[in-house]
């Protein structure tokens, strides 16, 4: 099967500039890369075709050979071999393209080396999360070795790796393609230590429990994260440290349930309070408040107390407190109380009962209608 013209593969004119070639290759790579098309053999083949075309056209010598002789320039060894030092750095190109797509960065020497990020879960009571708090925490981490100041060397001297010349990576040739990998001689550090530090044994870092004070802002909720820049693991060979991410988890509360910036709770009331109406006191996170219960209140009725919820950590507005009334059946009744209830119940007869208990009457009518339909 004959190969397609390289310019046609990338969709550019024969006089395309280097920048136009690079943009065309990026478009192709983003569309057909195997990571974005798992299991798609056709997409993978197109991606390889684009990669080969760009490898040739982005190299001045190879491009001139291709323009003069086409694909035959490489089939018969014309126009030079694989990409030398002047060829494109495919690792850098892929780092530019897919570092942004998948959240990573370039793996080449341009990538900034730093310490690893550290995660910590901080459990708080609801009151602490709502009001804000300063909490001391202790985390196991890697810190910079003090005797060698993170260099890993006992005398502070390090040598540039002769294999990678301090880049930390070496270039590997695979036919016309060039790849980069971590230098096996210096393990990607770019330097060598002849006299390792006796404290850290050349690592430049030591394990230690770090104690930190964290200021938790008012209004945080489960899942919120607090970033402490530079409080993660120390970087290798004196490079910058990572960050510490503190994830908040709020414990369940005995009274309140939280929904964003709003709070919910249940308020039990007696039958007499529900029937006759009353004013009841309820707890809020800021103290006590009053709810006026109107006469004939039923279980499930919601009362809204504006501004008695949680102050938002983002907008600083305050949520509301929703109180759901639950009519409580009395227990442990005395003989006199039982007698009074019997006398009260005796007043509910005939149409009088339907008038005083409309929901019960509706339910009974519904059940009767159901059985009538079943037996008809």
Swiss-Prot record:
The domain of life is Bacteria
**Which cofactor(s) does the record list?**
Zn(2+)
InterPro entries, per the entry: DnaJ, DnaJ_C, DnaJ_domain, HSP40/DnaJ_pept-bd, HSP_DnaJ_Cys-rich_dom, HSP_DnaJ_Cys-rich_dom_sf, J_dom_sf
Mind listing the GO biological process terms from this record?
chaperone cofactor-dependent protein refolding; DNA replication; protein refolding; response to heat
Q: Which UniProt keywords apply?
A: Chaperone, Cytoplasm, DNA replication, Metal-binding, Repeat, Stress response, Zinc, Zinc-finger
Classify the main location: cytoplasm
Domain (J) ranges: 5-70
Q: Where in the cell is it found?
A: Cytoplasm
Segments annotated as CXXCXGXG motif repeats: 145-152, 161-168, 183-190, 197-204
Positions annotated to bind Zn(2+) 2: 161, 164, 183, 186
Gene Ontology molecular functions: ATP binding; heat shock protein binding; unfolded protein binding; zinc ion binding
Which residues hold Zn(2+) 1?
A: 145, 148, 197, 200
- Assembly notes: Homodimer.
Domains: entry comment: The J domain is necessary and sufficient to stimulate DnaK ATPase activity. Zinc center 1 plays an important role in the autonomous, DnaK-independent chaperone activity of DnaJ. Zinc center 2 is essential for interaction with DnaK and for DnaJ activity.
The record's comment on protein family reads: Belongs to the DnaJ family.
Q: What is this protein called?
A: Chaperone protein DnaJ
Annotated organism of origin: Xanthomonas campestris pv. campestris (strain ATCC 33913 / DSM 3586 / NCPPB 528 / LMG 568 / P 25)
């Amino acid at each position: 099967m004959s190969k397609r013209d390289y310019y046609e593969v990338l969709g550019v004119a024969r006089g395309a500039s280097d920048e136009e070639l690079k943009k065309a290759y990026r478009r192709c790579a983003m569309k057909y890369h195997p990571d974005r098309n798992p299991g798609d053999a056709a997409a993978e083949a197109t991606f390889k075709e684009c990669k080969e075309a760009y490898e040739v056209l982005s190299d001045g010598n190879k491009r001139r050979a291709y323009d003069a002789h086409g694909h035959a320039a490489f089939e018969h060894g014309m126009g030079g071999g694989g990409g030398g030092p002047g060829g494109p750095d495919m690792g850098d190109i892929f780092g530019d393209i897919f570092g942004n797509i998948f959240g990573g960065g370039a793996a080449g020497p341009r990538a900034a080396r730093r310490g690893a990020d550290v995660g910590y879960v901080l459990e708080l009571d609801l009151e602490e999360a709502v009001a804000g708090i300063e909490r001391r925490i202790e985390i196991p981490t890697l810190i910079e070795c003090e005797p060698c100041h993170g260099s890993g060397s006992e005398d502070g001297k390090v040598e540039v790796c002769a294999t990678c010349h301090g880049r930390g990576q070496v270039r590997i040739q695979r036919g016309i393609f060039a790849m980069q990998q971590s230098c096996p001689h210096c393990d990607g550090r770019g330097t060598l230590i002849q006299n390792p530090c006796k404290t850290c044994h050349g690592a430049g870092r030591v394990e230690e429990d770090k104690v930190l004070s964290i200021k938790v802002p008012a209004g945080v909720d489960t899942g919120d994260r607090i970033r402490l820049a530079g409080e993660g693991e120390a970087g290798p060979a004196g490079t910058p440290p990572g960050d510490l991410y503190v994830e908040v988890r709020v414990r369940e509360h005995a009274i309140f349930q939280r929904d964003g910036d709003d709070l919910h709770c249940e308020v039990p009331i007696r039958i007499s309070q529900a029937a006759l109406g009353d004013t009841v006191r309820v707890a809020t996170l800021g103290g006590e408040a009053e709810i006026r219960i109107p006469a004939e209140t039923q279980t499930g009725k919601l009362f809204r107390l504006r501004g008695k919820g949680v102050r938002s950590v983002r907008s600083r507005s305050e949520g509301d407190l929703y109180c759901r009334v639950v009519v409580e059946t009395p227990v442990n009744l005395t003989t006199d109380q039982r007698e009074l209830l019997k006398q009260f119940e005796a007043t509910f007869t005939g149409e009088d009962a339907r008038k005083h208990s409309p929901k019960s009457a509706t339910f009974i009518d519904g059940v009767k209608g159901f059985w009538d339909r079943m037996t008809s």
